Amino acid sequence: MSTATLSKEQREELLKALKERFEKNRKRHEGLEWTDLHARLVRKSRALWSLSEMERTGGEPDVIGKDRGTGQYVFCDCSAESPQGRRNVCYDRAGQEKREKEGLRLAGNVLDMAAAMGIEPLTEEQYRELQKLGSFDTKTQSWLKSPAEITKLGGAIFGDRRFGRVFVYHNTAPCFYRGRGFRGSLTIQE
């Protein structure tokens, strides 16, 4: 993960956007207070940088919960569609290299992009939980963190919402589409 930091202006702009989104979407985090979250965020420069990367790439990150046991806040990309700045990617580096050898141009791969941003791709379980908070990916698709038993065979999974239902599918890891990106999560430690 990059050790990049934000300027004071960038931090203030990001915190303002996060607060506005927090206030506008209270159903995503009932019982949580912005003042508590803000106090934690201002002490976490790496987390702020990761959130700024989520924001910069179109993810519209918002807090979706707080672990009662650990006190950790969980942020997730809450953009209506898969983040625009993270589409046209295959699942992993091997898939990316295969496609590039074929002369195809793509934006990168999920695993490397997520690591560079300091976030984790959503798991299938997290994706289904997110979909309980609204209708996401009704026109796009999002790669999901894929189980080892699938990736070792060259596959990966992705999800979307169609016909009022959430679907999870499989594809080969080298596949990439203009309308398929990935959503990430970030846990803010105590």
Locate the predicted segments by residue.
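A binding-site-centric feature that preferentially detects glycan-recognition modules on secreted/surface proteins
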Residues: 2-120, 124-190
